[in-house]
Amino acid sequence: MSGLKQAVRNTAKIIMFKGVYPLCYKVSSLRPLRKNKVIFAEIRSGTLTDSFRYIYEEIKTRGLDPQVYYVHNNKGGMGYLLRYLKLTWLMGNVGCVLLNDTCNLFGAFKFRKGTKVIQTWHSCGAFKKWGESITDLSFGESLEELRKFPAHTSYTLCTVSSKECIWAFKEAFGFDIDNNSVQAIGVSRTDFFFKEENRVKAFENLYKNCPNAQYKKVLLYAPTYRGDADKAYIPEKLDIKALKENFGSEWVLLVKRH
């Protein structure tokens, strides 16, 4: 990208985040608060993902008004600035907004009193570093950039799977030790496993595709990638031979890469 083009992009971003979005939200929030209005901000996907789906279905049964807004944050160009503008206006009078990924729009202004901002995150646990935990690495953003356009300052609640994860999320989000918005109340996407019919179907599908797994213990190896997305690599340090020698024939190893 040329220096001039990058300068234009940077200037446009500053104008929108520091001027246009705060003003738009201020005007939008003059409208009466609709406590039963809920917005699901799907940051990257073009469909409702599993971290949202169960919450969405439950909310519908409670007489609330759930709406889904697809941000498509992973598309190139500067179109996201206009999509952010529309979302900013929509959030001006909502009772609750949920998001499932990093989105720096949520740090561009202070939400009105009465609006809850809930981060459900898109993955379970904390199996890799992100956010402010990787500012010293080649594929991480600089701390200066993260602080200039903060993404996590407005959360009322961030749901995580266990107490052991809390410190990792607080570090990645740049939270002070006294910030208690990260709570281990569970992750909605794992509700799937608490329905017996889903477990039965999962085992049936497993045995269909891997007959040798029947009547055996199953070990799943599911490594995530590290590095820049376009140069990502998967760790290949798993010693399958050693596993076989130590676990014996009563185990089956399944490999599912990110």
Task: Please identify what each model-predicted range represents.
Residues 1-39, 43-44:
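Membrane-proximal basic amphipathic "stem/tether" segments
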Residues 1-5, 9, 13-16, 48, ...:
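Intrinsic-disorder-associated interaction segments
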Residues 13-23, 125-134, 164-169, 203-209:
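Phosphate-binding glycine-rich loops and adjacent basic patches that engage nucleotide phosphates
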Residues 20, 68-69, 96, 165, ...:
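Intrinsically disordered, low-complexity N-terminal regions enriched in serine/proline/glycine
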Residues 23-34, 149, 207-213, 245:
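Short boundary motifs at domain starts and secondary-structure transition points
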Residues 30-39, 114, 214-217, 250:
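A short, charged/proline- and glycine-enriched loop
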Residues 37-197:
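Active-site and donor-binding regions of nucleotide-sugar-utilizing enzymes
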Residues 47-55, 188-258:
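Conserved catalytic-core segment of nucleotide-activated headgroup transferases in glycan assembly
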